[in-house]
């Protein structure tokens, strides 16, 4: 008989090959969001580069054991981490995301929130929150709850959207509660009991185009609800000189993260924090 991951007591093994919650919650995320992302993740420069930065960050700050990718959507990040040699459990409350993750071949998928799963206190070695925290109404309480689930010395890895001035209709549609600065993310992590080990901005070249092409049109009421076509256009890389410039910019940024350097501007924040080990 299979044992649920993380000592979870609120899960049952479903007929579709993944763990499911015995009860379900309401999500701050559009019902079709996972399917929209699934259709463009593999061809998106943004998702690909974020994965590369996450993998590099885990190499610099290795997890002490299995990483639980909380709110991990379709398993794009979890699949990349597994391929890079980091054992990963996907924890995704959306049914479509869990099913898409299974299609990607992930071995351990949990269709539940962390509360629904009932993970045991001090049981998780590492947690990933990749563009998840901005969806949570009370981010401090959520981080504190995750802190209680982690073993001393465990690490949490995060990405979040940056700068409230870059707010647009995409944030509204995605169910975001806020965007962060380095200082605000560091503050909430510390208040939750974590020691921040690394915190940088990333996608350093995107704030200006996002401001001009998303934020301003949204303020003026010109920006429409994102759809498959608009999302594909924004996430695809162009050929020629423009594509070369984007790839150079991404490569430069990746090299800085590999050396643990801090970037002072970007459309996202990338962070690593640790639950303080027991003294002695």
Model-derived segments and spans:
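A short His-aromatic
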Residues: 131, 135
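Short conserved AdoMet
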Residues: 62, 137, 151, 194
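A SAM-dependent methyltransferase catalytic signature shared across enzymes that methylate proteins
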Residues: 186-200, 247-252, 274
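A short glycine-rich, Lys/Arg-flanked "PGG" loop and its adjoining helix->strand segment in the class I
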Residues: 140-155
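Conserved catalytic loop of SAM-dependent methyltransferase domains
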Residues: 36, 76, 198-250, 264-268
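Conserved N-terminal segment of class I S-adenosyl-L-methionine
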Residues: 1-122, 126-130, 140-143, 240, ...
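A structural helix-start
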Residues: 136-140, 160
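Short, glycine-/aromatic-enriched active-site segment of Class I SAM-dependent methyltransferases
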Residues: 38-40, 156-190
């Amino acid at each position: 008989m299979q044992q649920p991951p993380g000592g979870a007591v609120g899960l049952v093994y479903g007929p579709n090959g993944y763990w499911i919650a015995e009860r379900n919650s309401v999500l701050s995320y559009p019902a079709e969001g996972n399917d929209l992302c699934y259709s463009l993740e593999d061809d998106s420069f943004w998702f690909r580069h974020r994965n590369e930065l996450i993998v590099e960050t885990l190499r610099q700050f290795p997890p002490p054991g299995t990483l639980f990718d909380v709110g991990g959507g379709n398993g794009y990040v979890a699949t990349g981490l597994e391929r890079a040699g980091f054992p990963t459990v996907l924890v995704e409350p959306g049914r479509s995301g869990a099913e898409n993750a299974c299609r990607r071949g992930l071995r351990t998928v949990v269709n539940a929130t962390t509360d629904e799963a009932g993970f045991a206190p001090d049981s998780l070695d590492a947690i990933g929150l990749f563009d998840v925290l901005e969806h949570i109404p009370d981010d401090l309480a959520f981080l504190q709850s995750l802190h209680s689930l982690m073993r001393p010395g465990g690490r949490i890895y995060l990405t979040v959207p940056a700068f409230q001035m870059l707010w647009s209709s995409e944030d509204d549609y995605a169910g975001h509660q806020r965007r962060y600065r380095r200082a605000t993310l560091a503050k909430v992590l510390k208040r939750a009991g974590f020691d921040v080990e690394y915190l940088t901005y990333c996608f350093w070249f995107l704030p200006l185009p996002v401001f001009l092409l998303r934020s301003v049109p949204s303020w003026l009421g010109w920006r429409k609800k994102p759809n498959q076509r608009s999302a594909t256009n924004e996430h695809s890389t162009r050929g020629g000189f423009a594509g070369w410039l984007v790839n150079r910019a991404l490569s430069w940024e990746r090299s800085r993260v590999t050396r643990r350097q801090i970037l002072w501007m970007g459309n996202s924040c990338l962070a690593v924090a640790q639950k303080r080990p027991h003294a002695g």
